[in-house]
Structures are given as C-alpha cells and as structure tokens.
Amino acid sequence: MKPTQFAMAGLLAMGVGLAAVPAAAQQRITVNIGSSHPTTNIWVHAMKEVFQPEVDRILKAGGGKYEVRWRENYGGTLYKFTDTRAAVRDGIVDVGMVGTVWENSAMPLQNVTYFTPFATTDHELLIQIFDKLNTTVPALRDSWAAQNMVPLSSLITDSYDIYANFPVRTLADLQNKKINAPGTSANWLRDTGATPVDGALTTYYTNIQTGVTQGALSFASGIGPARVYEVAKHLTRVDIGSMYFGSVATNKKFFDGLPKDVQDAFVQAGKATSKAHGEHVSKVAKAAMDTMKAAGLQVADLPAAEKAKWVNSLPNIVQPWLQATGENGKAVLKAYFDELRARGVKPLRDWDAQNR
C-alpha cells in the first residue's frame, strides 16, 4: 500500500472509530408541576406560560445536556387550595403554587403584609421585595426549608379596596354595614363601624345579591372575573394595599437532587416568572377595571382626611402576630418596612416603628 493510501485508510479507520463513539446522551428529568387553581388564575398563569418554557429555554441554551419532561397537574386535579403547602412539601408535585395566605398556623411569617395594611399599592414592587426577603432573611428562608420547600417566585394581589352596593364617602358610611372580609382582612375593618363577614371571591356575588353583606374588601383582578361589580356598583379606592400571597415553590428534597445546571435554570426561570406575574396582574387588573367601568361601576377615592382617620384609628393589629411569631416576626417586619422605605415607599402607617 502506498503511503498516501495507508494514511487515507488510517483516517477512514479513525473516522469509523469516531463515528462509533456516541455523543453525550441527553438526560431527561421528569418534573411534576401543578396547582389547586387553573392556569387562567393570576397566581398560576405564569407557571405555565413563563416558568416551564423559560426552564426549557435556559437548558437548551446551556448546551442541551438536560431536558425536562413536564407532567402538568393544574386546576386542582391532584389537590385543592387547602393543600397547596402539603402538596409541595410532601412531593405530590415537585413544583407548585403555595398559598401561604391559607397557612397562618404553619407559615405565619409569610403573612406579614396582611397584618400591616396601607403599606404599598405597588404589587410589582412587592414581588421584588419578597423575592429578596425569602432568600436573605434567615427566619423566612428557614421557614421555607422547615416545610421542605424552596421558594422560586413571589405571588401577590393587586391593591384591596371596597366594592359595595352603596357609596362610601366618609368612614361614617361604613357604620352598621356588613362587609365580606375573610380571614386576617377582617382586622382591616376594626373600629370602622363595619362588621366583617367571612367569604371568598366565589361567594361575594351571592352574599351581596341576597343581602348577607353589602360589599367586600377585594382587588380588581379578582372582582372582575367574579363579576361582583354586577351587584356592587360602587368602588371606593382606599388603598389598603397589595398583599404577598405566597410563592411558586419546589420541593426541597427534589431540588437538592437536581443537577446544578437544572437548579440554576429553576432559579433563573423563577426570576422571569416573578416579572411576568407582576406584569400579568397589572394587565388583568386594568382590563377588569375597564370592563367594570363600562358596565356602570362608579369609582371614587376616599378623601385623604377620611383615609387618614381610618388608618390611624386602627388598633395595633400587628401586635398579636408579633406575639405569636416572637423575634422572628420582629425581624421580618423590620426587613419588610426597611425594603419599602429603601425603594421610596412611604407607608401610611409605620407598623414597625410602633412595635420595636
């Protein structure tokens, strides 16, 4: 064989050998993702529309070594809203929407906003704050870990106001009125003369229609789809504020077992989900307000003097929460209000200052 033929044969042999070596196999990881609410819900929408595709995009951009196989369990197919914490904690799903608002006994620290009304109406800012607090405040971070969870993206409501079948021009207009204000929000009516009545977005319409109540404390992105404005024609803006609702979270044991690249993809996708969630709530709230106004909703602002009277007449409603949560609660309260002020927010009441 001539040298050139020998060299060519060698190269061909090498080529055959190289061809016989398979490329690095892509690792497929199954992720069970779910929620108690449908994907049309403001707290779930970005999970499906942003978190999942963003994880896929990041992994593909990183070389495609890993691929996620999503098993979707949205809309309460596996569990109801009362079980969002247990579902993620126990691994019924690997990633899920956790409504800490329903977990005041197991996760009280996360409910600080519900005990400190009139702090901020900027729900997009609130997302940024809690994305930070959940990972930097030891008490909050540890409380998630104690539940075998890692928070990835913060969930919020837009600002609460009064939707009623009567106008509210002064605080005196609330005297002897029954207002739907479930759970902790009942505290916001303390010493106003109104009587809080338990309920939910799914019951407000019937409650008001049948005279059980005359109105509800709620937010536009919820009231609009529930069509409560059909029986409550008056919206009084009082700026009770936006509330931290919970987080999209992942089961900690599951997360800790993921390859580092996939963990990083989850964290980065969580940040994108937070941004998209805030923008989506803004869009839904505006669309709801436009629809409600077109249907005849009368909108008015509570005069500043009357609002101040409401804010300052409230008893120290955060004190029982602080007594129950101790030093951890104080740390969370301080961190929350420090973040508000650092971002230019001036709370209408300094709940932290009066509870140092």
Describe these PLM feature segments.
Residues 127-139:
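Signature of the catalytic double-stranded beta-helix
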Residues 18-25:
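Sec/Tat signal peptide C-region and signal peptidase I cleavage site
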Residues 1-10:
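Bacterial N-terminal signal peptides that target proteins for export
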Residues 26-125, 140-356:
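N-terminal secretory/targeting leader peptides
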Residues 4, 25-26:
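Intrinsically disordered, low-complexity regions enriched in polar/acidic and amide residues
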